[in-house]
Amino acid sequence: MFKGSIVAIVTPFNNGQVDFEKLRELVEFQISNGTDAIVPCGTTGEASTLDYDEHMDVVKTVIEQVNKRVPVIAGTGSNSTAEAIELSQKAKEVGADGVLLVTPYYNKPTQEGLVRHYTAIADAVAIPQILYNVPGRTGVNMLPETVARLAPHKNIVAIKEATGSLQQASEILALCGDKIDVLCGDDFITFPMMACGAKGVISVLANIMPKTVAELTDAFYAGDMEKARQLHLQTLKIGNAMFIESNPIPVKTALGLMGKCSDEVRLPLCPMGAANKEKLAAIMKEYELI
């Protein structure tokens, strides 16, 4: 259902407020460069520091600007099941094509708790739902066997797998077959994960290099494995640079250096340190981004 290069778009700020004009410009930058779908209010979109009204206004703005040209998948995850249901229902009402649901963070549910959490959301809201496993940020790893229990639900269509583990992604693919799509959640293994059967990537790097990430996934689907492999290797250095500090600090800093939007982030995130900013700028110059 969702495939190819899917950008986890940043939420631009200006003096503490969401910069909706810049958000619309970023959407156009993505679509004009071949991005296949857009995820507002994910990790990269700083969803955890948006209030409810801001969250929904960002989702609505992206949906309006996209105007059905590509799918919009709203980040609606929460560590409160009730809140995740509320956000998902609202996203459906405003026209989202799907929702992305991060595993509950901080409260560390058991695997049974994860099954009940996602089943409750899928039963309550009839919209395509993407599970999102990112244990490095949440403190809980959703095991392949747990994904297999959820995969048959008609509203659960995919998982964003961001453990960085090809083994775990492969186990999900082996256990679930065609019951659920797998999307790569780590830019540095997009090509190898697609070779295992993933349908695409939910990408941080696509914020600054949308054309290149789209070319990689397009090449894979066209059967041009050599081109996809070369793009995979060529983008490793810049992709790794997106994580020299906590995401989305580097990618917002990069967008700032490119003049696309302010590099402003919300506390407790803070501006990138001078040494890392210098390092990032040097790498961006190598890629002729600035």
From Swiss-Prot:
It holds the Pfam family DHDPS. One of its GO terms (molecular function) is 4-hydroxy-tetrahydrodipicolinate synthase activity. GO terms for biological process: diaminopimelate biosynthetic process; lysine biosynthetic process via diaminopimelate. InterPro entries: Aldolase_TIM, DapA, DapA-like, Schiff_base-form_aldolases_AS, Schiff_base-form_aldolases_CS. The record marks T43, Y106 as: Part of a proton relay during catalysis. It is an enzyme of class 4 (lyase). Pathway: Amino-acid biosynthesis; L-lysine biosynthesis via DAP pathway; (S)-tetrahydrodipicolinate from L-aspartate: step 3/4. CDD domains: DHDPS (cd00950). Its main location: cytoplasm. Its EC number is 4.3.3.7. The active site is at Y132 (proton donor/acceptor), K160 (schiff-base intermediate with substrate). Catalyzes the condensation of (S)-aspartate-beta-semialdehyde [(S)-ASA] and pyruvate to 4-hydroxy-tetrahydrodipicolinate (HTPA). Homotetramer; dimer of dimers. Belongs to the DapA family. PANTHER family: 4-HYDROXY-2-OXOGLUTARATE ALDOLASE, MITOCHONDRIAL, DIHYDRODIPICOLINATE SYNTHASE. This is 4-hydroxy-tetrahydrodipicolinate synthase. It comes from Geobacter metallireducens (strain ATCC 53774 / DSM 7210 / GS-15). The lineage of its organism: Bacteria, Pseudomonadati, Thermodesulfobacteriota, Desulfuromonadia, Geobacterales.
